Amino acid sequence: MVGGREPGALYTLEDVVEETGADPKLVTELVDFGVIKGENRGGVRYFEETEREIVRAVSELARYGVGGRNLRVFRSSADREAQLLQSILAPALRSRNPERRKEAIEALENLASVTTHLKHLLLIRDLRRIAT
């Protein structure tokens, strides 16, 4: 269990606001700009754990004046990276062989980690250039 909840738990807007300290307007803005989506069930919008953590991170950025509109660049970048990684592993991910699919999912997680590290290094390099 993570944070007292079962894996795969869903969170209401109130849960997300309470657990992240985010302004409810910020969460609505993130939905409006497609940064998070949530899922409507019975007239109530629920968010996954990852979306809750996105709200937490954006809440930190909001303290520096970064809002939903500014986050399009991050969302677009993540979408492009996901498409690239999916295209690399698409045949294995579609395989009917459960072992091959499992290996592809593990490779996908590894590639995500490596690309995240690469992005971090490129950002640090560019920020150092700005600072000098």
Residue ranges of predicted features:
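Arg/Lys-rich, alpha-helical DNA-contact motif
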Residues: 1-132
